[in-house]
């Protein structure tokens, strides 16, 4: 249920501008850049409101919060369809940003932590397996609707889907279970470091890896072209990222679930640097290898963002803590396409030295976090 609702949430909001930006800009008389700036502003607002949304899930449970996010999504999408200029465009994405703060992965992970406690790892992995197909499923739907009924009606259709499909699915979620005080975080889980220090470290890890993820999502074909690949070859190689993400998540679900999540996170954080080094050293012949390695690491890291804090700190206060730790990652998600575009324009594939360094830094932080031997 939650996996399907998350597929709808991601596909109708986060992945929507990639399909509708050109149609929106043409009719409103603004550049596509302004469409993506409005989208980024919505992401920034979701980062600001994320901790409050997480705290609300801690107190009320996802069964009450997630359906409200569907209402907000529906309102924002309806406003987007009614947009008549740049100001109404920004207003619509601000409303959608409110919905994203309480309706995407962080909220879903917090909901599962409230329902299953420390046993939520498999459920979190399952959610990412299903919702990992959001772009695969929703991009063709949005493109077809845009061509047949127009971008405004497409927004209305997605708004209706939130009311008729997403909200009923979220209303069927189980009630959260009481979280025992014994599930509170243990100082030993961080090898004597304070909880706030570990939280800050994880926040950096998630921000660094998400910067790499969103940079590649926005610019991967161009990166591969800079390495010497033709446009057709670059697009074909970039298409391997999605299957690699899903394949890695299946591997995590069946094999790596017996290991502590920090092991998965360490491996995942090294994937992008290894792939980047391979591409820089070998050039275009390594384009497919880079896409597969990067995609696999990105797929597992998405899971780690939900399971690692749960394993280290427990389910108590998970929503608020997750919102605080993920706020920087959401910020970088909104700004990284612009920053990496500057780096790529100036340095070509040399821009991968920067993202690769971020991955190595993330691994270093994860390597400094110690867990009790009995949970490793």
What is the meaning of each model-derived region?
Residues 13, 17-22, 195-253:
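Extracytoplasmic gate region of multi-pass secondary transporters
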Residues 48-86:
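Conserved MFS/SLC helix-loop-helix module at the cytosolic interface between two early adjacent transmembrane helices
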Residues 49-61, 248-261, 344:
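Helix-to-loop junctions at the C-terminal end of transmembrane segments
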Residues 315-347:
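A late C-terminal transmembrane helix in Major Facilitator Superfamily
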Residues 1-32, 49-53, 139, 214-221:
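Extracytoplasmic
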Residues 102-116, 300-313:
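Intracellular juxtamembrane helix-capping segments at the cytosolic ends
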Residues 241-245, 251, 259-308:
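C-terminal transmembrane helical hairpin of 12-TM major facilitator-type secondary transporters
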Residues 126-175:
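Helix-loop-helix hairpin linking two adjacent transmembrane segments in secondary transporters
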């Amino acid at each position: 249920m939650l996996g399907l609702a998350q597929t709808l949430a991601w596909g109708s909001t986060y992945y929507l501008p990639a399909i509708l930006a050109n149609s929106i800009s043409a009719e409103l008389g603004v550049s596509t850049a302004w469409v993506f700036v409005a989208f980024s502003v919505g992401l920034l607002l979701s980062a600001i409101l994320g901790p409050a949304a997480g705290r609300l899930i801690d107190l009320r449970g996802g069964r009450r919060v997630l359906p409200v996010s569907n209402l907000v999504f529906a309102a924002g999408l309806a406003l987007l369809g009614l947009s008549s200029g740049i100001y109404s465009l920004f207003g619509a994405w601000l409303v959608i940003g409110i919905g994203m703060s309480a309706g995407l992965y962080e909220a879903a992970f917090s909901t599962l932590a409230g329902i299953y406690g420390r046993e939520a790892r498999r459920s979190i992995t399952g959610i990412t397996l299903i919702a990992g197909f959001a772009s695969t499923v929703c991009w063709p739907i949005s493109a077809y609707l845009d061509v047949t009924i127009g971008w405004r009606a497409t927004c209305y259709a997605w708004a209706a889907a939130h009311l008729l499909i997403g909200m009923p699915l979220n209303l069927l979620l189980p009630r959260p279970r009481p979280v025992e005080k014994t599930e509170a975080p243990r100082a030993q889980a961080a090898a004597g470091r304070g909880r706030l220090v570990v939280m800050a470290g994880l926040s950096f890890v998630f921000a660094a890896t998400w910067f790499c993820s969103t940079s590649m999502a926005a610019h991967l074909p161009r990166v591969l072209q800079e390495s010497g690949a033709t446009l057709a070859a670059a697009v074909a190689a970039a298409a391997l990222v999605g299957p690699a993400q899903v394949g890695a998540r299946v591997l995590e679900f069946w094999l790596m679930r017996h290991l502590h999540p920090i092991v998965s996170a360490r491996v995942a954080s090294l994937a992008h640097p290894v792939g980047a080094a391979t591409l820089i050293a070998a050039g275009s012949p390594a384009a497919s290898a880079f896409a597969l390695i990067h995609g696999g690491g990105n797929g597992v890291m998405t899971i780690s963002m939900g399971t690692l804090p749960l394993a280290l700190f427990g389910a108590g206060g998970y929503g608020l803590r997750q919102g605080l730790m993920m706020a920087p990652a959401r910020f970088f998600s909104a700004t990284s396409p612009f920053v990496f575009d500057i780096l790529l324009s100036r340095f070509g594939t040399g821009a991968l030295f920067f993202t690769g360094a971020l991955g190595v830094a993330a691994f270093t932080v994860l390597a400094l976090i110690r867990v009790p031997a009995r949970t490793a």
